[in-house]
Regions:
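Canonical Rossmann dinucleotide-binding motif of NAD(H)/NADP(H)-dependent dehydrogenases/reductases
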Residues: 1-31
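Substrate-binding pocket helix/loop in short-chain dehydrogenase/reductase
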Residues: 56, 104-105, 109-117
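The beta1-alpha1 cofactor-binding region of Rossmann-like NAD(H)/NADP(H)-dependent oxidoreductases
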Residues: 67-81, 110
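Active-site loop immediately N-terminal to the catalytic Tyr-X3-Lys motif
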Residues: 103-106, 154-161, 182
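Active-site helix of classical SDR
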Residues: 128, 165
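Alpha-helical segment proximal to the catalytic Tyr-Lys
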Residues: 133, 178-179
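Residue(s) in the substrate-gating loop at a strand-loop-helix junction
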Residues: 149
Length: 194
């Protein structure tokens, strides 16, 4: 992945961190995006993204932090701007940002539903929208990966909001893969079983 530039949302911990460290080890320059909040999406901070950047740089890689929320259009655009300002281009986007607000459907609030859909599905849409536009200007294709879940494919008790969002990502990927073919943009989804 030498000379490739990757943006990874939700890269301050867990699977996103693993993606960031792996891509950096393989030679990519990485934008580590993370709002730095709790698992339920509350709060924010810079230490999570900064910690992953420090790990990458200490291992000899290239990385910069971005602390924006994927749910905000201006912040999603800023992720692409951060990549281009730091590394001159974009090549790879991994939509990994996510939160959990698990509750059985009969007890779920509208706010719990909306928050999860907003981060997982709208967040992936906004990040992809700006990344896609940058790829079209570059004219060299690119790669997009969506982090889904088996909860979106086979279900999991107490995760109607999360399952719906993750199933939505799989559908989003399928259509983007069709539309991206003529531009050399490959789109895939990962559905890990946790």
């Amino acid at each position: 992945l030498d000379n490739k530039v990757a943006i990874i949302t939700g890269a301050g911990g867990g699977l996103g961190r693993a993606h960031a460290l792996l891509l950096a080890r393989e030679g990519a320059a990485v934008v580590v995006n993370d709002l730095g909040g709790a698992r339920d999406g509350t709060g924010s901070g810079q230490s999570m993204a900064d910690g992953v950047v420090d790990e990458i740089v200490a291992a000899g890689g290239k990385a910069v932090a971005n602390y924006g929320s994927v749910t905000d259009d201006t912040s999603a655009q800023a992720m692409v701007t951060t990549a281009k300002d730091a590394f001159g281009r974009v090549d790879i986007l991994i939509n990994n940002a996510g939160i959990l607000r698990d509750r059985s459907f009969k007890n779920m609030t509208d706010a719990e539903w909306d928050a999860v859909i907003d981060v997982h599905l709208r967040g992936a849409y906004l990040a992809t929208k700006h990344f896609w536009a940058a790829l079209l200007v570059q004219g060299e294709g690119g790669r997009i990966v969506m982090t889904s879940s088996t909860s979106g494919l086979i279900g999991n008790f107490g995760q109607t909001n999360y399952g719906a969002a993750k199933a939505g990502l799989a559908g989003f990927m399928r259509v983007l893969a069709l539309e991206g073919m003529k531009y050399g943009i490959t789109v895939n989804v990962l559905a890990p079983a946790a």
